[in-house]
């Protein structure tokens, strides 16, 4: 068929369509199918733009032309499914005239292109009218997947499957309740809530997750209503512990709920009926007093339960203790560092915390260290469980703090933690605490992993965190995955791609995620149905800003990597994008692809980055690390490149000290120091240029930066010394040769590390614990007679004084490289053998600083009176001096540098 024939046929059809009302009544299914054939011809012959122009002019004259609306509507819709206005107008005209067969056909044609919500809802209406009940579940399912706001059909699906497939029914009830929560429809929430209580009452934790979301989104009053519904069910079962948790949940939200307090006392009596003094504990804790804060009185009640003979307790200062005796006045506790300590009940309630026998702190106190460390290393799951249960909720940093260095080294932790992370991800007993960021809780009831992941996905609001949950779910091994949950997560990203009105980083990220699914699951990838006109080229054209802004907006490194891959796979002008990206997003694949295409272009890029190294620090560091892999001529000397790198290094230290973007600065610092030392860049450059002055300048530039990490400074010095063994550094003149200078005091690296650890412990542990002690003691009143308060205040004064002293010492300390110590004269870092001419015996001393001084071990500070009198003496010198009216006479026999292990 020629172009002319197709256009002529179109003109003929449009003329027939002139009198709309008559045409609508006379339209048949055959006529619509004839239009479908014409539309296919128009697309095949590339006449879309011409036909849209013709139809546009026609519709100005005949606004309700069926043919004009349908042909133009389908052509536009096939390009961009969101633009369905003309087709909806046709559907509306036929619906008014009860042409349901035609409406059904048009809806099905639209659905071949995209899951159009209006078409789906219209088909559901038609099937219901025609009593085609067998078709309804299928169309309801498609509506639920296409319309995340639907609450009608998701509930109908759940009800439909109740007697056919209960697991599928529960899945849709779960989906329904989250949608009702999002819409804040309390009647729907309660209806579905009742169903979930009936069908999955054994999954108590899923109810708590839903309640947390309701409290957050709808307020505590609505949450209480659902708590009470849950109580009505659990109170009639044998689940006493869960019932108590429900009542505690109510009272945390509504402190003065009298009925809940009464019921709580009733169930506590049942739960602890075997405890001898349970009634006394209930009375003493005053748990039914509505004027008292529930959380406080319940904590008191729990403490009374635990203050029984043989139970363990914890005190901020005295650590773990065991209750040895209980009487009417209080308890006697044997602490690790304080035996037989009597504490009155009032003080015990505020100062002590109960510990279970399986608490990690108890295990540390009562189990031999080697035995406990061995079990922790071998039974990782047990160790994680013990630590999490000890603290109720804890993150990986907290777990590390509990284990390193007390039970394992840092290097052991590195491998141990990798296995621990996998267990936390896969084991259904370990659940993320929605109330605390990155914290885990232990769930005695094994959660269904599918439901656990689904609940996490639904509760999470952040796009990129949802992506991480989705990918984790895709990667989980050893379980049968729920098809509906997997598709629900997948659909979240599909909606972004197929139903956007404006392209943002979420849309592009979703496209990248969907296109890269083959890396994880071919089966899942086969279910991805992206609209045919949506591709990376069209998305980037519609993105309102440039590719650099897009990369900055994408908050996931894996998505960025996959986007780099897709740019080359899908775009003919990928080189332009890669050139623009490189200084901002360092990527080896990107550079190698550019280099294969045009090495000279890469050379220009590298030189541009070097010229602007202060702006493109990441790219600059990457170039220095990898440039030897490419045949590139740089416009800068090795000396210049090294000097620039040192400027980046020292600038990062200054920013860290000033807390100026310290996270990014720490990252840059680590990258540079690794390049210089670990990757051997400093050594390789100095070997080539053989410039001793440059080497000295590198070291001294770092030396004069305040708080430059001593360990790294010594590494730099050591590398330089290997290449220039006779080099003299300015800081060495401050050592103890004839030109001594006061610069605070000298020390060795290990001593500084110990002092820094002491300072950290003081700041992060001792002072905060002391503040808590003061607060608890103050709550008891009567400060004049309060011995605990006065003791804590005295300790506060001591800690403050020690803090100030330690900070000043660390600031004034200068670390000396033990490899470069001089031994021609007595000075810091030397061992001296002297003859005592009074006793006739040889005496041997190590000369170090105030931090290392230990006269009983023969270690003398060079700043002590005795040490100062030995300084600068040489072998063969005779020494005569007086200290505290005592005469000393020595002959210097031997001087040598101290050998540090």
Curated annotation (Swiss-Prot):
Region (GREA) residue spans: 741-901
GRAD2 domain boundaries: 20-170
Domain GRAD1: 171-681
Gene3D superfamilies: Tetratricopeptide repeat domain, Transcription elongation factor, GreA/GreB, C-terminal domain, Transcription elongation factor, GreA/GreB, N-terminal domain
Any one GO molecular-function label of the UniProt entry: RNA polymerase binding
Family the entry assigns: Belongs to the GreA/GreB family.
The protein's name: Transcription elongation factor GreA
């Amino acid at each position: 068929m020629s172009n002319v024939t197709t256009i002529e046929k179109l003109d003929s059809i449009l003329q027939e369509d002139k009198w709309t009302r008559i045409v609508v009544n006379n339209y048949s299914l055959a006529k619509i199918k004839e239009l479908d054939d014409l539309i296919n011809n128009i697309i095949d012959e590339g006449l879309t733009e011409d036909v849209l122009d013709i139809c546009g002019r026609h519709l100005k004259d005949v606004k309700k032309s069926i043919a004009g609306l349908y042909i133009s509507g389908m052509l536009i819709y096939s390009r961009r499914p969101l633009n369905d206005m003309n087709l909806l107008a046709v559907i509306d005209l036929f619906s008014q005239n009860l042409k349901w067969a035609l409406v059904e056909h048009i809806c099905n044609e639209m659905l071949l292109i995209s899951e159009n919500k209006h078409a789906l809802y219209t088909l559901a209406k038609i099937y219901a009218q025609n009593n085609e009940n067998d078709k309804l579940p299928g169309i309801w399912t498609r509506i639920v997947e296409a319309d995340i706001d639907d609450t009608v059909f998701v509930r109908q699906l759940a009800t439909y499957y109740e007697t056919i497939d209960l697991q599928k029914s529960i899945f849709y009830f779960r989906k329904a309740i989250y949608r009702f929560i999002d819409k804040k429809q309390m009647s729907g929430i309660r209806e579905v809530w009742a169903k979930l209580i009936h069908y999955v009452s054994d999954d108590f934790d899923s109810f708590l997750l839903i309640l947390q979301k309701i409290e957050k989104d709808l307020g505590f009053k609505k949450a209480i209503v659902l708590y009470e519904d849950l109580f009505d069910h659990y109170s009639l079962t044998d689940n006493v512990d869960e019932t108590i948790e429900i009542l505690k949940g109510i009272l945390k939200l509504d402190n003065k709920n009298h009925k809940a307090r009464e019921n709580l006392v009733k169930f506590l009596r049942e739960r602890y009926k075997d405890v001898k003094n349970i009634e006394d504990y209930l009375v003493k804790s005053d748990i039914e007093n509505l004027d008292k804060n529930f959380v406080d009185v319940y904590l008191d009640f729990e403490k009374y339960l635990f203050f029984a003979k043989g139970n363990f307790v914890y005190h901020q200062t005295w650590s773990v203790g065991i209750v040895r005796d209980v009487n009417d006045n209080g308890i006697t506790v044997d602490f690790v560092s304080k035996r037989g300590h009597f504490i009155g009940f009032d003080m015990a309630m505020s100062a002590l915390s109960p510990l279970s026998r399986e608490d990690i702190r108890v295990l540390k106190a009562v189990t031999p260290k080697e035995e406990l460390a061995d079990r922790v290393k071998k039974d990782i799951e047990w160790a994680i469980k013990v630590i999490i249960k000890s603290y109720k909720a804890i993150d990986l940093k907290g777990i590390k703090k509990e284990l390193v260095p007390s039970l394992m080294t840092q290097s052991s932790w590195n491998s141990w933690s990798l296995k621990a992370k996998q267990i936390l991800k896969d084991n259904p007993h370990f659940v993320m605490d929605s109330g605390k960021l990155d914290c885990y809780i232990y769930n005695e009831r094994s959660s269904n992993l599918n439901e656990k992941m689904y609940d996490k996905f639904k509760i999470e609001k952040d796009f990129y965190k949802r992506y991480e949950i989705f990918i984790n779910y895709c990667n989980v091994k050893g379980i049968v995955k729920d098809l509906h949950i997997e598709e629900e997560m997948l659909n979240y990203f599909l909606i972004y791609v197929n139903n956007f009105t404006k392209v943002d980083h979420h849309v592009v990220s979703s496209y990248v995620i969907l296109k890269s699914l083959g890396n994880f699951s071919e089966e899942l990838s086969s279910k991805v149905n992206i609209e045919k006109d949506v591709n990376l080229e069209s998305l980037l054209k519609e993105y309102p800003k440039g590719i650099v802004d897009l990369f900055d907006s994408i908050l996931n490194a894996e998505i960025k990597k996959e986007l780099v891959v897709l740019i080359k796979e899908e775009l003919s002008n990928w080189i332009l994008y890669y050139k623009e990206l490189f200084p901002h997003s360092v990527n080896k694949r990107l550079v190698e692809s550019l280099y294969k295409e045009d090495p000279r272009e890469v050379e220009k890029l590298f030189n541009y980055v070097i010229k602007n190294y202060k702006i493109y620090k990441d790219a600059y560091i990457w170039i220095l690390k990898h440039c030897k892999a490419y045949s590139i001529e740089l416009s800068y000397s090795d000396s210049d490149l090294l000097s620039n790198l040192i400027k980046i290094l020292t600038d990062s230290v200054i920013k860290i000290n000033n807390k100026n973007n310290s996270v990014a600065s720490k990252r840059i610092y680590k990258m540079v120091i690794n390049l210089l030392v670990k990757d051997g860049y400093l050594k390789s450059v100095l070997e080539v240029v053989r410039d001793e002055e440059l080497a000295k300048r590198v070291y001294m530039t770092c030396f004069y930066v305040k708080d430059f990490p001593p360990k790294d400074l010594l590494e730099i010095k050591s590398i330089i010394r290997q290449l220039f063994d006779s080099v003299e550094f300015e800081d060495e003149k401050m050592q103890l040769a004839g030109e001594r200078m006061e610069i605070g005091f000298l020390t060795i690296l290990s001593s500084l590390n110990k002092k820094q650890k002491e300072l950290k412990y003081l700041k992060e542990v001792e002072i905060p614990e002391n503040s808590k002690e003061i607060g608890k003691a103050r709550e008891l009143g009567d400060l004049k007679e309060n011995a605990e308060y006065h003791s804590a205040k005295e300790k506060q004064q001591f800690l403050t004084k020690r803090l100030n002293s330690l900070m000043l010492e660390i600031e004034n300390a200068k670390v000396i490289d033990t490899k470069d110590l001089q031994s021609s004269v007595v000075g810091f870092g030397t061992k001296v053998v002297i003859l005592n001419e009074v006793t006739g015996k040889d005496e041997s001393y190590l000369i170090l600083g105030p931090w290392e001084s230990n006269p009983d071990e023969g270690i003398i500070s060079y700043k002590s009176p005795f040490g100062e009198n030995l300084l600068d003496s040489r072998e063969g010198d005779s020494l005569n001096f007086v200290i505290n009216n005592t005469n000393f006479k020595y002959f210097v026999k031997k001087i040598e540098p101290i050998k540090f292990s």
